[in-house]
Amino acid sequence: MDKNKEIVALCALNKIFGYHPALALELMENAGGALALFGPEPPPVKGHPELQAQLGPRMLEWAARELEQVQASGFRFIGLRDEDYPPLLRECPDPPLGLYVNGSCSPTEIFSLRPMVAFVGTRDMSPYGKTWCRRLVEALSRTRNPPCIVSGLAFGVDGIAHRTALECGLPTVGVMATGIEKVYPRQHERLAMDMVRAPGSGVLTDYPLGTAPVALNFLRRNRIIAGLADAVVVVESKSKGGSLMTAKYAMGYNRDVFAVPGRLDDVRSEGCNSLIHEHMADIVTSPEDLAACLGLGAPVRGAGGSWACSGGGFQDALSKKYGDASDELRLGMAVKIQPGTGPEALQKLVGLPYPRILEVAGLLEADGFLISDFLRRFSPAPPWD
């Protein structure tokens, strides 16, 4: 099988079957792969003649041009069968056939190094919701196994979760309902770029380039958020909203769902209270409770008993010395996320040539950021460990 041709075919199928990925998977399994669906006689697509009509050479030509533009723009397209594809999302019965990714590090570094916890909720959040969204993310940053924070880059809970994660040195991933080159809302363009530059972070979508933010697209985005994460935390939600759909998707994928309780007379808490009442979500009673349920270890309080994060001291120190887009920052944060990593594994995680890995790791060790053992496995040096 020609891998490049198969990726082109997957990109084409992703456009055709974006709202019916499970159907595409069934067709691929029966035909023996994505490219096999574009033969002289495309297989019948029962109930969807409009989809069958698109299984032709013109769509493959479009996909080839699409992938060229993606690469030229500095983005990545990851097919469902690629080893870089998010492992939890691949386990879902209806995973996207491909993902467009924008980040400064390798997809493996984004998707495979640590647990992923989604924070979702209303755009119209209350001061109570904002406070507890921040406190919970801050507390998770102080656990033994800090997670990656996943959300949807929207106003309200999404934006607070992403920004707090960055402030605490946590990686964070934003799932968009637009093309990878568009950020919606536009007011979050700076936030998205900060995420793209941060180690272990980035933004992604399953929509082709040029896709506008129409309402229907957000259902697919919510499905991806639920599939990416080990657990979903609903911070605030009205009785109807996208975050409740995300919670239901998560339940269908056998993910853990948590909800922050709110006042009985606050419409912005009706959805959370209903999830708890109907036993569709576990109640969040404290940051310690959430961390324990997630299996991340007990969070350690900061000075004065506060959950406030330290601002990502290790990351800040690396950025100050080497720059926000430096190889030193990327490699240092990869070691911080996965201590005891050798040069070969770092080469795969960070995507640098082996000699450059040794050069950068040696510099970080000489500057007091890393230590190594006799097997040349690197870990953060005290006090960063």
Question: What are the residue ranges of the model-derived segments?
Answer:
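Short, small/acidic-rich helices and loops at N termini and domain boundaries
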Residues: M1-D84, D367-W384
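Glycine-biased, small-residue-rich flexible motifs in mid-sequence functional cores and linkers
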Residues: D2-N4, G79-D385
